[in-house]
A protein has these predicted regions:
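Conserved catalytic network of the ASCE P-loop NTPase/AAA+ motor domain
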Residues: 81-84, 299-304, 331-335, 353-355
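Electropositive, glycine-dotted interaction segments
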Residues: 97-244
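Conserved ABC ATPase signature
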Residues: 225, 231, 240, 247-251, ...
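Conserved P-loop NTP-binding catalytic core
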Residues: 49-115
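N-terminal pre-Walker A segment at the start of P-loop NTPase domains
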Residues: 4-25
Length: 376
């Protein structure tokens, strides 16, 4: 069989399928360019978000650590009634360019060697395939308990030559990216997804204090480099879009970045000039909601937009008046990134729908199981 090729590193996700993970017994979700996930508390929105995040972390070799932060494998498996057969957590993703990736993990078996790491996942299956429209599917990676076989750059099968970590993805263990270009491209695709959930805005948060800054086209996941990220947008991104968003959100307010050459300690810091206030307010004086909105601005206006950008409950701590400007920014960002938004806010989801014409995906929980509203 000859070599195969797929060229788009930024291909969108066509569908996400999750089974055996917390409240997700068996859920298949088709996705578009802009996806807003809504539903009541406890319906499973965050579980869906986390399942996508698990694939991202698996590509970086951090699957076991990420699951351990959730309590380990026994804590994350579907706890409801099961059919007979192996207990598995399975996540699969298919892309619009014909690429698919499937990862299944489970618990240690009775005859496995004794280990103190009983909360770690054991990878049971891993598979990647590629199918161009109208052509037969080509397997790029197939892993079972006995080992893994990979498609190389000549289109031939190679048995993975190194000992595999049983709790991590093959993708994270590739040592010769030039030899396995398709799998390396898949790994970089998953690693390139971007997730934002918990910006630190407490009194001791780094973003409230001046920070040494470097060129920062991608805001960190906790927002500690906010000042540098905003200055990067000013110098190398949508400067006018940034100024406009700040003015609209804060009734004519003005964003100020104190630069190293303006200070004795050579650090960047955020300030805001607000209507009716006679002096600029420093970051340590700004509200949690104001700082969170500025973090969202930096994420959504990144000069290096990701293929997939996921925001989990972006409305947290925001004043209701900020939801319309936020919705506009999300819709604008969807022109360059596939967006995944989980939200409790009816107002935010309705405003996104008004601006984009995209209806939200509504979840519910029935007998402990997460389902979409149209699920039968």
């Amino acid at each position: 069989m000859g070599a195969v090729s797929f060229t788009s590193m930024s291909s969108s996700i066509a569908a996400l399928t999750v089974s055996g993970y917390r409240s997700l017994r068996d859920l298949a979700l088709p996705l578009g360019q802009l996806n807003v996930i809504t539903g009541p508390n406890g319906c499973g929105k965050s579980n869906l978000y986390r399942s996508l995040f698990l694939l991202h972390r698996a590509a970086d070799g951090l699957l076991a650590r990420t699951l351990s932060e959730e309590g380990g494998m026994p804590s994350v498996l579907w706890a409801g009634a099961r059919k007979k057969g192996p207990v598995r957590l399975q996540i699969a993703v298919s892309f619009t360019d014909g690429l698919t990736y499937h990862l299944a993990c489970g618990l240690p078996e009775v005859n496995d060697l004794p280990s103190s790491f009983k909360l770690d996942p054991l990878i049971k299956e891993e598979k990647a395939t590629f199918s161009e429209r109208g052509s037969q599917s080509v397997t790029l990676l197939e892993r079972a308990k006995s080992g893994a076989s990979l498609r190389d750059n000549n289109g031939g099968w190679v048995h993975f030559p190194l000992a595999l970590s049983r709790s991590e993805s093959v993708l994270s263990q590739l040592a010769e990216p030039h030899r396995y270009p398709h799998l390396s491209a898949l790994r970089e695709r998953l690693r390139g997804w971007r997730f934002y959930h918990a910006f630190r805005t407490d009194e001791q948060a780094p973003l409230r204090q001046p920070q040494v800054g470097v060129f920062t086209p991608v805001l960190s996941d906790n927002g500690h480099d906010l000042a540098a990220a905003l200055q990067t947008i000013i110098e190398a991104g949508d400067t006018e879009g940034l100024w406009r968003a700040v003015r609209q959100a804060f009734d004519g307010g003005e964003l100020l970045i104190t630069l190293p050459q303006d200070t004795s300690d050579g650090r960047f810091s955020v300030q805001m000039r607000l209507p009716g206030v006679l002096r600029p307010l420093h970051a340590w004086e700004l509200s949690d909601g104001t700082l969170r909105f500025l973090c969202l601005l930096a994420a959504l206006l990144s000069p290096r937009p990701p293929a997939v950008l996921a925001l989990n409950e972006p409305e947290t701590s925001l004043h209701p008046d900020l939801l319309s400007p936020l919705a506009a920014l999300i819709v604008q960002a969807s022109a360059q990134s596939q967006m995944w938004i989980t939200t409790h806010s009816v107002r935010l989801s309705e405003e996104i729908q008004r601006l984009s014409g995209v209806s939200p995906i509504t979840l519910r929980k029935t007998d402990g199981e997460t389902r979409t509203l149209y699920h039968k």
